[in-house]
Amino acid sequence: MPPIVISWLTGFISGLLLAIPVGPVNLTIMNEGAQLGFRQAAMISTGALLMETLYCGVAFTSFASVFNHAFIKEAMDLGSFVFMLGLGLWFLKAKAVRNPTKIEERLEQKFRPTSAFMTGFVRVMGNLGVPASWLFFAVYFDSHHWVDPAPASKAACVFGVTTATGLWFFGLSYAAALGHKKFSDRTLLRMERGSGIGLLVLALAHGCQIVWQMHHSHHL
């Protein structure tokens, strides 16, 4: 399979895993879609998608290359495992849908978004878990060569993230407008836990690889 296709698939799968968990953006899309229709929810989705893509693009094109030093790379590799494990457990143990954080609320008070587009944009901007997640994923994908260092491959990965996130946001917008918020909290939590299981599987595979590398280096 060509590296650029692998990069796109990597971005698509990781984008979907991070888009599904229920947070303020998904709840806003659902509520607005149910009350004001698809167009309103789609504009929120567009703003949220743009900010998500910007965070992801910066992580893959700027910060990932900073961690190329061997020691830093190993530390970040271990950090990525801990991060994915923790995030997966957090999603898996979710018992209620999350409300906006204090940072998100402060940003909304400061920027006072007057359009649906800016509401989605600011909601993602204030969620510091988004850039943190993409930073760890960027380092992880780079160190395991899932995303080729070539600019075209990195662009393909970011495009994969945008595609998956966009499909989820706009699909959620359509479903909310069509079904008038027929998704129950229980259904949303099940989807979030499914995403958590996916992250735990990825963390487990990464942990096994770290153990194998340590065992291999010990016997050299």
Residue ranges and their predicted role:
Residues 3-74, 136-156:
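Juxtamembrane transmembrane-helix termini in multi-pass membrane transport proteins
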Residues 38-116, 175, 207:
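Membrane helix-loop-helix hairpins that form the core translocation module of multi-pass transporters
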Residues 46-58, 126-129, 161-169:
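Membrane-embedded alpha-helical segments of transport systems
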Residues 2-4, 73-78, 86-131, 135, ...:
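Alpha-helical multi-pass membrane helix bundles of inner-membrane/thylakoid proteins
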Residues 76-87, 153-165:
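Alpha-helical transmembrane segments
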Residues 57-60, 166-182:
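Transmembrane alpha-helical segments of integral membrane proteins
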Residues 80-83, 195-198, 202:
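Hydrophobic alpha-helical transmembrane segments of polytopic
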Residues 60, 126-131, 199-213:
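Hydrophobic alpha-helical transmembrane segments in multi-pass integral membrane proteins
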